[in-house]
């Protein structure tokens, strides 16, 4: 299938950004703060602005809260307990959102944070509430930035899987396209 055929009926896209693609790995130290590369976050904000300017709705699913919190506390990745990862997520989430907010603000774009869990998406009432909230944000050209609510989840934080969350969100918002940005070559299972 040709790219134009795929994009012809496109109205809404979900983009999942993995923590590895916004981290400091192989990137300039000058833009680094709490493990996040501000240069890369600004780059993705510019790209999302271009997509939005073409008339597409964009929903962003982002990882990075646990990493940012871990970096902020000066902890290594190895050996963290579930409660420690949850604490890192709680600390890192606000910094992650602040970084996105500043990058999108430079493009005159507004963002909104939505934290979801499998429990939210498995409960019909909460699922519909999330859907309606996202629809209201998109109607106002606000970019919803969704992350797993890692500070209260247990199973999901063990896996660290926002790929599954992004697929569920794509269904939730009736997206025609899901883009997963990751350092994994191919499909990860």
Which residues are covered by each model-predicted region?
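Nucleotide/pyrophosphate-binding catalytic subdomain
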Residues: 1-189
């Amino acid at each position: 299938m040709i790219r134009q055929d795929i994009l012809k009926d496109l109205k809404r896209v979900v983009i999942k950004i993995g923590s590895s693609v916004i981290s400091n790995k192989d990137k300039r130290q000058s833009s680094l703060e709490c493990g996040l590369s501000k240069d890369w976050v600004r780059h993705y904000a510019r790209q999302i602005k271009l997509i939005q300017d073409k008339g597409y709705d964009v929903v962003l699913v982002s990882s990075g809260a646990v990493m940012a919190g871990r970096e902020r506390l000066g902890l290594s990745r190895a050996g963290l307990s579930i409660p420690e990862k949850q604490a890192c997520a709680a600390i890192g989430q606000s910094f992650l959102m602040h970084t996105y907010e500043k990058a999108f603000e430079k493009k005159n774009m507004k963002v909104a944070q939505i934290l979801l869990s499998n429990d939210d998406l498995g409960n019909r009432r909460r699922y519909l509430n999330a859907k309606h909230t996202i629809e209201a944000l998109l109607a106002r050209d606000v970019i919803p930035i969704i992350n797993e609510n890692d500070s209260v989840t247990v199973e999901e934080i063990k896996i660290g899987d926002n790929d599954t969350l992004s697929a569920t969100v794509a269904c939730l918002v009736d997206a025609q396209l899901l883009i997963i940005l990751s350092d994994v070559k191919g499909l990860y299972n």
